[in-house]
Curated annotation (Swiss-Prot):
EC number(s) recorded for this UniProt protein: 2.3.1.234
Originating species: Corynebacterium diphtheriae (strain ATCC 700971 / NCTC 13129 / Biotype gravis)
Stored InterPro entries: ATPase_NBD, Gcp-like_dom, KAE1/TsaD, Peptidase_M22_CS, TsaD
Position of the signal peptide: none
Protein name in UniProt: tRNA N6-adenosine threonylcarbamoyltransferase
HAMAP family membership: TsaD
Gene Ontology CC entries for this record: cytoplasm
Family: Belongs to the KAE1 / TsaD family.
Amino acid sequence: MIVLGIESSCDETGVGIIDLADDGTMTIVGDAVASSMEQHARFGGVVPEIASRAHLESMIPVMKEALAQAGVERPDAVAATVGPGLAGALLVGASAAKAYAAAWGVPFYGVNHLGGHVAVANLEGEELPHSIALLVSGGHTQILEVQAVGKPMRELGSTLDDAAGEAYDKVARLLGLGYPGGPVVDKLAARGNRKAIRFPRGLSRADDLRGEHRYDFSFSGVKTSVARYVESAEREGRVISVEDVCASFQEAVVDVLTSKAIMACKDTGASVLLLGGGVAANSRLRELAAARCQSASIELRVPSFKLCTDNGVMIAAVASQLIHEGAQPSGLSVGTDTSLEVEIPLVHSL
């Protein structure tokens, strides 16, 4: 069975195609992605209207490329992200998916974007057991309890302000490093001293870890602290080491991300920690997560770099799992939801 997935929740237009075997084995046969990142760079962040227009322009070329890679003219099922994400961006992808499904006469599945990030784990390893997923990107920073791919997830914690990726972008802007901030901060941090400056770790005090925000994050404080450090240096005429600032900022972020994720694994008895989202490509996050997982006897699963960022393959993957388990299609009348809850893997009505 050939399952096609469309991703358009933010600034990537992705079409992925999976060959789903009768035993549930999934093989990637098509994967095409177009990004509008360069169009957003001069604004220092994603502009929803620009993202929506870019999806419109890219959808057909990306679709043709993925189908050509797979060597098929039409799939047996079509899936699309219907939430969470940017309203206009979601509408473009979901509308295209439903139009293709209607034209091809195949069922449509409206799936959860976050479930897609979890589903990629089954593409590159054994079936995911009871796990904790740490999803980190420019739009999301969440700790989720996962029983299995395609099943309702439970949110244990999330950011109360900026997402981690958003904090990277804002700090990069403060330092004049451009957009997106994640890759350049990570690169410069590798040459800096991560102990040079002690930036705050949000919601990591003893009282926080005992209370309702045990698994929650806050990155506005570290962002503000970096801004004050830079402003103070400018006032005093001091030359700062951008590499040290990047390394110290990054350490503050990944320290709290990994410590809370490991804590969630221990508290829930989960044997696996899964990293997902664009920030999962960060070298220091991977390094520290690996060290802390090894120390805690927890298995770490990290997708390949290409599958960390938004893509259509992850949407095809979660749909394939649902189809294999006998889930009914969504129907063409299903809408989109910018704040779709993680407990909903497949949408039948909104």
